[in-house]
């Protein structure tokens, strides 16, 4: 019974059906213009939401899907614009080959809550904070890019991405989640939180210190992780079947507290 009490999550990925099980639909599409360019195609239809106060399921007519069309500086930007909670949540399904950018004020947060997101472009966090409110909230993103003074909170959810590109001064908080990187990347910012960090392919170059990272790090057979700071992998366990490089020949690194387990192929 969702007519009262607290609802966890968001109804954006639910479909509205009639008594016979038929999906109710009356969709329209609209171009979304940014700086004079068509950056996305929006689909509007009947939809369910959990309300601003998470106090039930509500029927409305609104945005149900975003099809990303552009990349780089022309990408669609999401901005909290002073809103919080569900008012700053994007629950519509995000698809397409374009990039998805975020550019809020430093203390503001945009959340994503549709587990059916499957966009393949870059997730470009240019300003503010991003909160994952579902598994695969970042779709099938090819890269997670965090600028200085930005933050991504995985909030206990799972995500697979191509590369990580975290600038110095950024924070990626795994926060009980599970992050898999298939193509490595560069982490010059802070990695924090518990959970799991899996590098299944490519080279991940970790140059920043991450003393608050307690997650288990797993290096797959086809992956390489290069560590340039004693606190790069925090205090979590490191399991490696691939290649783990600690510093350089003339500047070796001793992991501060991590336990390293090496398998036969590691």
Label the model's feature ranges.
Residues 1-3, 9-10, 21, 26, ...:
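Surface-exposed loop/turn positions within long extracellular repeat scaffolds
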Residues 1-91, 174-176, 181-183, 199-203:
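Extracellular/surface-exposed low-complexity segments
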Residues 100, 178-179, 197, 266:
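Hydrophobic beta-strand segments of well-ordered beta-sheets in folded domains
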Residues 77, 99-107, 197-199:
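Short, contiguous hydrophobic alpha-helices characteristic of membrane insertion segments
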């Amino acid at each position: 019974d969702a007519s009262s009490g607290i609802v966890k999550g968001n109804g954006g990925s639910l479909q509205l059906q009639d008594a016979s099980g038929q999906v109710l639909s009356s969709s329209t599409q609209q171009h979304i213009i940014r700086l004079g360019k068509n950056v996305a195609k929006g689909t509007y239809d009947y939809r369910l939401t959990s309300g601003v106060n998470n106090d039930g399921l509500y029927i409305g007519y609104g945005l149900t899907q975003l099809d990303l069309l552009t990349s780089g500086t022309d990408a669609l930007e999401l901005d909290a614009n002073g809103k919080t909670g569900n008012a700053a949540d994007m629950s519509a399904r995000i698809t397409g080959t374009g990039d998805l950018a975020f550019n809020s004020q430093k203390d503001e947060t945009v959340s994503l809550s549709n587990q059916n997101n499957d966009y393949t472009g870059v997730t470009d966090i240019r300003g503010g904070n991003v909160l994952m409110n579902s598994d695969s909230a970042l779709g099938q993103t090819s890269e997670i890019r965090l600028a200085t003074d930005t933050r991504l909170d995985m909030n206990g959810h799972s995500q697979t991405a191509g590369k990580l590109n975290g600038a110095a001064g950024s924070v990626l908080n795994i926060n009980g989640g599970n992050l898999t990187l298939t193509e490595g990347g560069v982490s010059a910012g802070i990695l924090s939180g518990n959970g799991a960090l899996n590098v299944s392919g490519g080279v991940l170059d970790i140059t920043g210190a991450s003393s608050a990272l307690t997650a288990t790090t797993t290096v797959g057979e086809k992956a390489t992780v290069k560590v340039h700071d004693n606190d790069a992998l925090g205090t979590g366990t490191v399991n490696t079947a691939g290649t783990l490089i600690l510093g350089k020949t003339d500047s070796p690194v001793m992991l501060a507290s991590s336990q390293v387990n090496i398998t036969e192929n590691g």
